[in-house]
Structures are given as C-alpha cells and as structure tokens.
Swiss-Prot record:
Name under which the protein is recorded: UvrABC system protein C
Pfam families reported in the protein's UniProt record: GIY-YIG, HHH_5, UVR, UvrC_RNaseH, UvrC_RNaseH_dom
Gene3D superfamilies according to UniProt: 5' to 3' exonuclease, C-terminal subdomain, GIY-YIG endonuclease, UVR domain, UvrC, RNAse H endonuclease domain
Quaternary structure (record): Interacts with UvrB in an incision complex.
Entry's family note: Belongs to the UvrC family.
Domain GIY-YIG: 16-95
Disordered: region residues: 492-511
Claim: Thylakoid is one of the keywords in the record: no
Keywords: Cytoplasm, DNA damage, DNA excision, DNA repair, Excision nuclease, SOS response
Length: 692
C-alpha cells in the first residue's frame, strides 16, 4: 500500500484548467481515469485525509503510485478524452463504465427509406452514421431539441412511424414543426433525405453555409416586414450556434496524425506529442530534454522527428535517454510502421523536404509535414502546446523544490566561483527602464536556493539621467550596502562613516529583522563585465571588498549564459546542464520579473500625473470634476478662484488652494512638472499646462 503523500504533486503545480487525470500503479498501469472542470480542485480531494475518503477511493489512492494529467480547453474536450482513455486503458477502478455499453452516440439510420435520428449505443452498424460519442444521452437529446427546429427530420421508432401513417395523423412533433412528418406524406422521401443530409453536413462541421443562408433569409424577411418569420429565423440561428460546441480533441473521422509541440528556455525543452488515430486522441507522451546548444524550435523539431520516427528510440538529452522522471507515456512508442499520414509541428524543420522524404521512405507512403494555421487542427495544436508548457512548469517546480538538486547547485557554485562557503543567501540586482525614463531597479533574495519574497526590495533610481544601466546598477548596489553599513553602525558593529544614512532609514524596534540587516554570500547582477565593474566600484566606494574575504560578486550575461567575475578577462563557463547554472538563471529571471513589474507600475502612475496632483486635499474625484468642467489644466490655471469654486464639490478655500498650487507650477518656477497626460482626456499636457 502506497502513501498518497509520497506522490502528491507539489503545491501550485496542478493547473486550475479543465483536464483529464490518470492514476498509475507502481508498475505504470493506468488504474483510474477521471475528468475535472478544475484539475487542482478535483485532485485535491484525492489527497485529503485518507480516513475521510470513500472506501473505494481509499483503495484506489493507496494502490496508485503516481498521478498525471492532460489539460484541455473545455469540459467537452475533457469528457471526450476521458471516454477515449477509459476505452483505451480499461482502468480497474473505473467500474461504472465496465458494462457492455459504450458512451451513447447520435446515430442517423441512412439505410432506411426515411432515415431516423436517434440515440444509439453498442457496436457500430452498417448503414448508420454516428456523431459523438457523448458523455450522456441527455446531451444528445438537448442537441436534437435545438436542431430539429432547423432540420425537422424523423426521430420516432418504426412502430410509431407506421401507426401514424395508418391513422393519417402525425405525432406531436409534427404539429409543432419539429418534424417534417413524412409519415403522413407532408414531404416525400427525397425531400426528407435532403433534410437529413443537411443535418449530417451541419454535424460534420459545415456550419458556416447554413448560418449564412439563414442570416440572408432573416434579413430578407425583415425587409419584407415579415417580422414573425424573421424572429423565427433569428431563433433558428441561435439554436444552431448553441447546438454544436467544437471539440478540439476530436478531428474528423479517419484523421490519423501526430501533433507535436514544445516549451523551452535556454537550457531545456519540454516536448509533448498527441497521437490521433481515427479522429480520436489515442495517446500522449512527453519528455523534458536538455539543450546542448542554442537551437531554434525548428532545429528541435528536426531532432525530434529523426529520433522518434527514424531511430526508433525516444528523443533525449545528450545520449538519447529521456528524463524518466518527467516522462508521461499513454501510448507505445511509434516505430516506423506507425508513422501517420500527417504530422503537425509548431515550425517546419530547416530541411523540411529531406525530413519528409525520409519519413515517407520509412512509412512506405506519403507523409504530410505541416504547420496548422487555422481550424480544428490549429486548436488541437494549441491544446498540445498548453500541455507542453504545463509539463515544463511542473518539471521546473520539481527541480526547484528538490532539496538534493538545490544542495548540489549551491555546492557547484561554491566550487566554480571559489567561494569560502556555500552561497546560502544570494541577492540579485536588475535595472529596468523605457528609453531612460522611469528607471527602477530590483533586488531579489534567494535563501537555500529558494526565493525569500519578504526580503525583495525595489529602488527608484534618482542619481542617473537618461538610459545608463551601468550607472544605475552602481547606484542600486551602493544604496543597498550603504544601508547595510548603517545598520551595522547602529548596532555598534561598525563606527559611523561619512554618507551613511541614519535615523530616518531605520525601522522602529518591532523585533523584526531590519530591511537590509543581512549581508549576502553572493551578489549577482544581470549583465556582463560593465555591470559587474559598476557593482564592484560601488562596493569599493563603501570600503567593502568584492571577492574572498568580502562580498562575492558575479554577473550573468544573457544569451550565452556566461558568468563574469570582477577583474577577470575570461568568463566562468558553467555546464549547461548544471544545477548551478539553473539556479543562477532562476535568480536572474526572478530579478528581471520583479524589476519589470515595478517599472510598469511606476510608468502607469506617471502617465496620469498632472499639476493638480500637488493640491492638498484635492482627490481624484474632484480633479476629474475640474478637468471635466474646464477641459484642461491650462484652462483651470487661467480661471480665477471664484470661477473654480462654481465647480460642484469645490469650495472657496479649495479653489484658493488650487490657484496657489497652479501658480507655483507655472512656467519659470522650480516646481514646474514634466509633461504629463490628462487623466480625463488622455491628451498630453506640457509644463505650462497647455494641452497639445
């Protein structure tokens, strides 16, 4: 018996989207398949206190050894995929589907003179066209109820049909125009079969021409002032649009295709492949592979196709072995004999014709290698892409939460950077701006290889004009460590030093650690030699050594992922598959995310600033009232206190304060604000308050 906690996914790793989940036993066999509107909410139920679960559920979760899932777009797709995989794997705990029935389908008995629309289960019959399967029979009846008003085909049994013909009176559906009543001769066999053919075409996905035809008829009826008929056609159009929800995981019958998608970063890539056979998703496989070089998605596609279909082995990192910890197989490997006629990829490989020719030789027949651009195949590709991203996110979460991997990363960093101790506290700095405006910087902290978000800090750059990332980095590092020295001086560990902030920058005695109380074991800056030199200069100015015996410093350059140290002509090259480089990347990316978030926030705030912001007691509501009344700040400045006081909500005293504040911000004064944007109209306002 397994403990469910031993294979419970990490917190936050399960998506909140619709999907299908699979429990496997210790031998890898699928023992249960289920669907969920929210995978996170549903799977959380299985990992609750085991004593609160149903006895059968207890047995299932203790028999299982792992759980995996596949995300889809809608609940309908989840129902469809659940059905497919229950029939595929025959899981032992899915007992309610283990009878001799299958899911119901919508069947059209084309072999009859007057074809009938009906719910049908069991094996397929000759001369019957099927649509579905559906999860429930009531879903078929709802669909028919919507469509019969547009396609009034026969739905009654043979006995009812014959009896109506004998008495010369149709059933109720014939009286309410939901049946064309061929039983009493209202339409002949040819006319009724045309209705049935139109119904089949519509259910096959050819919806556009019927909708366009009904819309033309509706407009014509409205122009002819036949309003009742126009209203009925309008309702018919609505019924057609509600009747069929497109199912991306089900392609037209007979479609055999493999759908491949990737999610990647600089070091790794996740690949997902869905096997579509007979229009149904019959299986799914996924891997996370190492990238030994800077390859494009097209290169990844070529490597995957050759290894998956031509070598007969799984795609792999360096030696052709998959990362088994992140492999999710729901289908057998696809040898050359199973190469489908169509392979859908996100990008064509560089030499697509040659790859296609090799695949055709292996298959012995034509193979179409293509990128889906629209329609159901494009929608299915997007579903596979979401699964690849989800698998990649889960892989990164597992790796970041792996204590052994984190310990190895810290040890590797200590060795590579020749640090006296493992860098248990890492601080990373990044600068963000838009063409030199709203310049900000971020500081993120990782302790024991995990983010410590309560220690994150943001800096608004004050001493740098224009776009100068190097000077901004120097200011940021200088400000951070000057506060650290001030804290040491406050506690008596260090004598006072010139320029150290005191008093106002100190937190009250609350018992909590002060904002910059702890020194880092390693400082990482986002950038190459210029940024590293700027940070080292800031430390030197404060009398802090950068290197052994002081604060270790390095920079991580983008693209090539080189690690630069102060006063070194050559970078430190960490193996691309090392945990140390992966940790530095996570730290750098988190600093970049935090800086970008703050920069966007600050830029958004500055976009709605105006001279009226400096008026004491004037809130946003009254500022908008002023701008709505006068039209611009310039016209407010030109008005007198008495005129301003006429605006609703503005009293005489507030009007005088507005006049005084605008006078201080007039041209020629030191307090004149920079150009801003009128928050009401969106127009640009110059320093004189003139709207341009």
């Amino acid at each position: 018996m397994a403990d469910p906690a031993s294979y419970r996914p990490p917190p936050g790793s399960i998506p909140e989207t619709p999907g299908v989940y699979r429990f496997r036993d210790e031998h890898g066999r699928v023992i249960y398949v289920g669907k969920a509107k929210s995978l996170r909410a549903r799977l959380a139920n299985y990992f609750a206190d085991i004593h609160t679960l149903h006895p059968r559920t207890q047995h299932m979760v203790t028999t299982a050894g792992s759980v995996e899932w596949t995300v889809v777009s809608t609940e309908v797709e989840a129902l469809q995929l659940e059905y497919t995989w229950i029939k595929e794997f025959d899981p032992r705990f899915n007992v309610r589907y283990r009878d001799d029935k299958s899911y119901p389908s919508l069947a059209v008995t084309l072999y009859e003179e007057f074809p009938r629309l009906q719910v049908m289960r069991g094996p397929k019959r000759r001369g019957v066209r099927y649509f579905g399967p559906y999860a429930h029979a009531w879903a078929i009846r709802e669909t028919l109820d919507l469509l019969l008003r547009v396609f009034p085909a026969r739905t009654c049994s043979s006995g009812v049909f014959k009896r109506a013909g004998q008495v010369g009176r149709p059933c109720l559906l014939g009286y309410i125009d939901r049946c064309s009543a061929p039983c009493v001769g209202r339409v002949d066999a040819d006319a009724h079969r045309q209705i049935v053919d139109d119904f089949c075409d519509f259910m096959s996905g050819q919806t556009g021409r019927y909708l366009r035809r009904l819309e033309r008829e509706m407009r014509a009826a409205a122009e002819a002032q036949e309003y009742e008929r126009a209203a009925r056609l309008r309702d018919d159009i609505g019924a057609l649009r509600r009747a069929v929800e497109k199912q991306a995981v089900v392609l037209p019958d007979g479609t055999d295709a493999d759908v491949i998608a990737f999610a990647q970063d600089e070091l790794e890539a996740a690949v997902q492949i869905f096997y579509v056979r007979g229009g149904r998703v019959r299986g799914q496989r996924g891997w996370v592979v190492d990238k030994l070089e800077d390859v494009t998605t097209a290169d990844l596609v070529e490597q995957f196709l050759t290894q998956e279909y031509l070598d007969g082995v799984r795609p792999a990192g360096t030696a052709g072995t998959a990362d088994t910890a992140d492999t999710a197989d729901t289908a057998d490997p696809a040898p050359a004999a199973q190469i489908p006629r169509e392979i859908l990829v996100p990008e064509l490989p560089p030499d697509a014709e040659a790859v296609a020719e090799l695949l055709e030789r292996a298959r012995g027949a034509r193979v179409d290698l293509r990128v889906p651009r629209r329609g159901d195949k494009r929608t299915l590709m997007e579903t596979v892409e979401r699964n690849a991203k989800q698998a990649f996110t889960l892989h990164r979460t597992k790796r970041a939460g792996d204590l052994t991997a984190r310990s190895r990363a810290l040890a590797d960093l200590q060795e590579a950077l020749e640090l006296p101790d493992a860098p248990l506290r890492i601080e990373c700095f990044d600068v963000s701006n838009t063409q030199g405006t709203d310049v900000v910087a971020s500081m993120v902290v990782f302790e024991d290889g995990l983010p410590r978000k309560s220690e994150y800090r943001r800096f608004s750059i004050r001493g740098v004009d224009g776009q100068d990332d190097v000077a901004s980095m120097r200011e940021t590092v200088h400000r951070r460590f000057s506060r650290y020295l001030a804290e040491r001086a406050r506690t008596g560990e260090l004598e006072e030093y010139p320029g150290a902030p005191t008093g106002d920058d100190e937190a009250p005695e609350t018992g909590r650690p002060r904002r910059f109380a702890y020194p880092p074991n390693l400082v990482v800056v986002d950038g190459g030699p210029p940024q590293v030199a700027a940070a080292a200069r800031a430390l030197d100015e404060l009398g802090i050594e950068s290197g052994p015996g002081g604060v270790a410093l390095c920079g991580l350059a983008k693209r090539l992922e080189e690690v630069w140290l102060p006063d070194q002509d050559e970078p430190v090259i960490l193996p691309r598959t090392s945990e140390a480089l992966y940790l530095l990347q996570r730290v750098r990316d988190e600093a970049h995310r935090f800086a970008i978030t703050y920069h966007r926030q600050k830029r958004s705030t500055s976009m709605v600033a105006s001279a009226l912001d400096d008026v004491p007691g004037l809130g946003e509501t009254r500022r908008k009232a002023l701008l709505r009344h006068f039209g611009s700040v310039a016209k407010v400045r030109a008005a007198g206190a008495e005129e301003i006081a006429q605006v609703p909500g503005i009293g005489p005293r507030t009007a005088e304060a507005i006049v005084a504040a605008l006078a201080r911000s007039a041209p020629g004064t030191d307090a004149a604000p920079a150009p801003a944007v009128d928050p009401l109209t969106g127009e640009i306002i110059d320093s004189a308050g003139v709207t341009r």
